[in-house]
Structure formats: C-alpha cells, structure tokens
C-alpha cells in the first residue's frame, strides 16, 4: 500500500441492455476526458475556478449553509473528523473546526497535497481563502474575525494523508485512528470511474468510522464533466437513487438529506443538482 503521512456478457434485453449501454457511455467519456489523477490537473487553477470566488456560488453556499447548521448546532459532534473531500478545498472544514479537536485530511494526488500544505504552512503561492472564510464567519455573525478562524482551522488539522484509491486497503489504522465523523465533499464521483468503484470507495472511506458515527456526503447529481483551464475532466454520472441506495448498502441509516437543483448557466460544469446525505453507521460492510 502506498501512502504518506504528514503530521502538523452477454447482452440480453431491456434492463440488461440499458446497463450495458450506460457502462459503455461512461467508458467512452472516461477515455476522452482527462482524469483527476492526470498531470494536466492544476490544483490552484481548479480552486480559483470553482471555490474562491462567486463563479459558481452554489458550490459553496449549499454545503457551507448545511455544515454550519450541523456543526454549530451540535447535531454532528465528536473529537475526530476524517475529511475525504475534493482537492485542496478547505471551506467545508471551517465550521467543523468549531466542533472537532482533530481533523485528518485524505487526498489522492501529490500536487493537491502539496497545494493544501502550502495553505496549511502559510507558504507563498497558497490559495487565498479569505472569501470563503468571510462567508463562513458571516453565518456566525462575525465576518471580521475570519483571520482568527483560519488560524483555528490550521491548528485543528492533525494530519494530511495520501492514499491511492486503487489500493484494496484503506489507510493503516496505526496512522489514522477511528473517527467520529467522515465528511466527503464532491470527491466520490471524481475519483471513481465506475459505479462499482463508487461503491467500493465509499466502503473504504468509512471503514475507520466508529459504529454510530456519522457520514456527511455531498455529491453532484447527473454530472459528466468539469473544466479546468483548457481541459475537460471526467466525472462519474450518478443519480439520487443510486447514491442513496449505495449509502444504505454500505451499512448506514440515512437520517436526513438535502437536494438543490442547478440554478446557474455555465459551460464549466454540467451537474443537474447537488445532494447532501447525513447518515449514521449501523454495521460494518465488507469491502
């Protein structure tokens, strides 16, 4: 297993035919579009395009509002949180730092880890997250204290872990303790090339979640691509029912969900809507 820890058939008819065609379409898109692991993925440009300004405000306002309500109300609580979210994004952790003493960040590529650490260590060239931090502080009624909030978040990051999602085993438990909450923001459909991989990856992400622990999963619905610079990248297209059923099959009881339809006009991204599922771990599901 490769990881690093930085501390600070036959086609029949109808349904079978449809599934086969759906799989073929996904394979074609996967082969013609770039992938998250490709060298052309620019971590800083990606963040500047989607998450540090008002280009696509739904990407931030939808999850930030939900997470503020969950973490600040105490509906989700504990000491340790595992963040398996997209790229070097941090805004989903701002409210979480009010509730959790330790946050572990899992990422899949060296460039994204490097860029996340640039922010963590205040290095030159790091992404400026002041816009998101001010937005998060507005929810708390103290917009002017965003710099204090940023320092609070930095101190809460207990580790940054690299994991190759093509490995069968998740992170060594000696490096990552059992956690009270797993937060997954936009990541599953980006790193999973098939629905089977989506299911396996969700099981792996949540294997270190304590029984009774909580999963907060954000996913794009019926999305096929996103653009970074001059490149179009693949994303696995899944519908709401598939996401819900996968969460249940993985051993979770869904407690609440939120859905918002697309409300913007842009060629950068083609999602139909965004879904958030809050679920509680009921049992272990073999990988």
Where are these regions (language model features)?
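Class I SAM-dependent methyltransferase Rossmann-like catalytic core
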Residues: 18-78, 91
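A short acidic, Gly/Pro-enriched loop at the edge of an enzyme's catalytic core
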Residues: 169-182
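A short glycine-rich, Lys/Arg-flanked "PGG" loop and its adjoining helix->strand segment in the class I
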Residues: 176, 197-211
């Amino acid at each position: 297993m490769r990881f690093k820890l930085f501390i600070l058939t036959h086609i029949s008819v109808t349904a079978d035919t449809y599934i086969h065609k759906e799989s073929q379409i996904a394979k074609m898109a996967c082969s013609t579009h770039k992938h998250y692991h490709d060298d052309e993925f620019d971590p800083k440009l990606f963040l500047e395009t989607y998450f540090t300004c008002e280009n696509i405000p739904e990407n931030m306002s939808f999850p930030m509002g939900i997470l503020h309500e969950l973490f600040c109300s105490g509906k989700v609580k504990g000491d340790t949180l595992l963040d398996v979210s997209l790229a070097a994004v941090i805004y989903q952790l701002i409210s979480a730092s009010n509730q959790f003493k330790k946050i572990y960040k899992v990422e899949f590529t060296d460039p994204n880890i490097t860029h996340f650490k640039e922010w963590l260590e205040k290095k030159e060239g790091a992404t400026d997250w002041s816009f998101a931090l001010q937005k998060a502080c507005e929810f708390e009624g103290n917009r002017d204290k965003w710099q204090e909030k940023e320092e609070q978040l930095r101190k809460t990051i207990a580790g940054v872990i690299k994991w190759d999602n093509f490995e069968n085993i998740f992170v060594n438990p000696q490096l990552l303790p059992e956690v009270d909450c797993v937060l997954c923001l936009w990541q599953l459909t980006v790193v999973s090339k098939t629905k089977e991989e989506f299911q396996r990856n969700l099981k792996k992400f949540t294997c270190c979640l304590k029984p009774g622990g909580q999963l907060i999963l954000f996913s794009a619905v019926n999305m096929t691509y996103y653009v970074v610079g001059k490149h179009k990248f693949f994303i696995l297209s899944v519908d709401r029912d598939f996401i819900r059923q996968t969460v249940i099959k993985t051993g979770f009881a869904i407690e609440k969900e939120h859905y918002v339809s697309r409300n913007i006009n842009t060629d950068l991204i083609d999602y139909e809507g965004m879904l958030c599922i809050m679920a509680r771990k009921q049992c272990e599901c073999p990988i």
